[in-house]
From Swiss-Prot:
It catalyses: oleanolate + UDP-alpha-D-glucose = oleanolate 3-O-beta-D-glucoside + UDP + H(+). This is UDP-glycosyltransferase 73C13. An anthocyanidin binds at H24, A396. The lineage of its organism: Eukaryota, Viridiplantae, Streptophyta, Embryophyta, Tracheophyta. Transmembrane segments: none annotated. It comes from Barbarea vulgaris. Optimum pH is 7.9.
Length: 495
């Protein structure tokens, strides 16, 4: 066992740097626990506000004997021109704060360097989020290998790798509506330019920031990916080859959450009582409920959210609809009551205003489908739970994840969204899927057609494969062993 080797032979010490956004921090905390379970000392470096978000989950892990500690560093907000109270990416009130936020994050280099000078035992490895390029300078200064964590799947990472090497493909497109085929890909997959996460809509300083991220990616020792070999074998193999063998698939990392409290409190504390949620779910038939959650940074306009709600109502199926960022959706709240929507659906629909215990809900026997924005965490959690996906991508890597789920894995149905929601242009884009489109897509996913049954069968099969991957002898379990042995050899050769 590697945990025995680490104790006897070399006391490995990993320092983890999660990016300050829920979708990035949640899997990084899971990774910390997985490594600590192998006897590795873990130090998580983050800001006070972000540390507070995960206090309960980490305290339970520490109380169980796992060697995890948190070191807090103050975000230099004022120095970067960032107003106080914007310590997380998902709390930014406008796109204008994006550049100051990233500048403040990368100004952490100096205080973190001082931390490393005093840290004991000396770190053997850094695991850093892709969005924190300054950690490359720390790794270089202290001669420590840096492992990168993107928070994406191999399908998406390979797509980005191929398109960066063949950038003329995207650059030569005549319009944003023109389709192109990704070359050198295991499957024939088409995209439009706005659907791939290699371009950006934010001008100016943002290009320099993303350039630093790409440069830091090139100089990292390797990459860990929250996926498993069984889920996307061809893409995992090709991406590993592209990274000269230094890519380890170690997921689904969410499966380290085995107790109810950990499942319920991943990220923020849930805004619904766990017992109340379970009572509602227990009252529904097996596989009958559609879980609807469009992520922590959903930017759909009011007109589209209304159509989504009406489509869910007309589907005549029980549903849970989670609306995060509730304070930004006051108009929707008014519409719920003024239009009579909330009253009409009260017996069949459960509205969760804020944060939901997503893993707890997805693993419940009454849930039979997941309408998702296709963020990779949610996509993987849905597939791991054996649920078919109704895909509604918004931006970033989400169109890649939709293609993987629907076209490659054949475990989902597309809602029909074909263009990203550009920040600041939501109202202009307006409604992309009307209520009839929503109703039709729900039926395609949850209905009794042969296609729907096959999608559900396939999703269940993938869920079983994902669970096997993290068990002893499974691919992800073995890859964690391989990663630790690699870093151990490196650490011993450096001494």
């Amino acid at each position: 066992m590697v945990s025995e080797i680490t104790h006897k032979s070399y006391p490995l010490h990993f320092v983890l740097f999660p990016f300050m956004a829920q979708g990035h921090m949640i899997p990084m905390v899971d990774i910390a626990r997985l490594l600590a379970q192998r006897g590795v000392k873990i130090t998580i470096v983050t800001t006070p506000h972000n540390a507070a978000r995960f206090e309960n989950v980490l305290n339970r892990a520490i109380e169980s004997g796992l060697p995890i500690s948190i070191v807090q560093v103050k975000l230099p907000s004022q120095e970067a021109g960032l107003p106080e109270g914007n310590e997380t990416f998902d709390s930014l009130v406008s796109m204008e704060l994006l550049v100051p936020f990233f500048k403040s994050v990368n100004m952490l280099e100096e205080p973190v360097q001082k931390l490393f000078e005093e840290m004991s035992p000396q770190p053997s490895c850094i695991i850093s989020d892709f969005c924190l390029p300054y950690t490359s300078k720390i790794a270089k200064k202290f001669n420590i290998p840096k492992i990168l964590f993107h928070g994406m799947c191999c399908f998406c990472l390979l797509c980005m790798h191929v398109l960066r090497k063949n950038h003329e493909i995207v650059e030569n497109l005549k319009s944003d509506k023109e389709h192109f085929v990704v070359p050198y890909f295991p499957d024939r997959v088409e995209f439009t330019r706005p659907q791939v996460p290699v371009a950006t809509y934010v001008p100016g300083d943002w290009h320099e920031i993303t350039g630093d991220m790409v440069e830091a990616d090139k100089t990292s020792y390797g990459v860990i990916v929250n996926t498993c070999q069984e889920l996307e074998p061809a893409y995992a193999n090709d991406y590993k080859e592209a990274r000269s063998g230094k890519a380890w698939t170690i997921g689904p990392v969410s499966l380290c959450n085995k107790v109810g409290a950990d499942k319920a409190e991943r990220g923020n504390k849930a805004d619904i009582d766990q017992d109340e949620c379970l009572k509602w779910l227990n009252s529904k038939e097996e596989g009958s409920v559609l879980y609807v959650c469009l992520g922590s940074i959903c930017n759909l306009p009011l007109s589209q959210l209304k159509e989504l709600g009406l489509g869910l109502e007309e589907s005549q199926r029980p549903f849970i609809w989670v609306i995060r960022g509730w304070e930004k959706n006051k108009e929707l709240l008014e519409w719920f009551s003024e239009s009579g929507f909330e009253e009409r659906i009260k017996d069949r629909g459960l509205l969760i205003k804020g944060w939901a215990p997503q893993m707890l809900i997805l693993s419940h026997h009454s849930v039979g489908g997941f309408l998702t924005h296709c963020g990779w965490n949610s996509t993987l959690e849905g597939l791991t739970a054996g649920l078919p996906l109704l895909t509604w991508p918004l931006f970033a890597d989400q169109f890649c994840n939709e293609k993987l789920a629907v076209q490659v894995l054949k475990a989902g149905v597309s809602a029909g969204v074909d263009q990203p929601m550009k920040w600041g242009e939501e109202e202009k884009i307006g409604v992309l899927v009307d209520k009839e489109g929503v109703k039709k897509a729900v039926e395609e996913l949850m209905g009794e057609s042969d296609d729907a049954k096959e999608i559900r069968r396939r999703a269940k099969e993938l869920g079983e494969l994902a669970h096997k991957a993290v068990e002893e002898g499974g691919s992800s379990h073995s890859n964690i062993t391989s990663l630790l042995e690699d870093i151990m050899q490196l650490a011993q050769s450096n001494n």
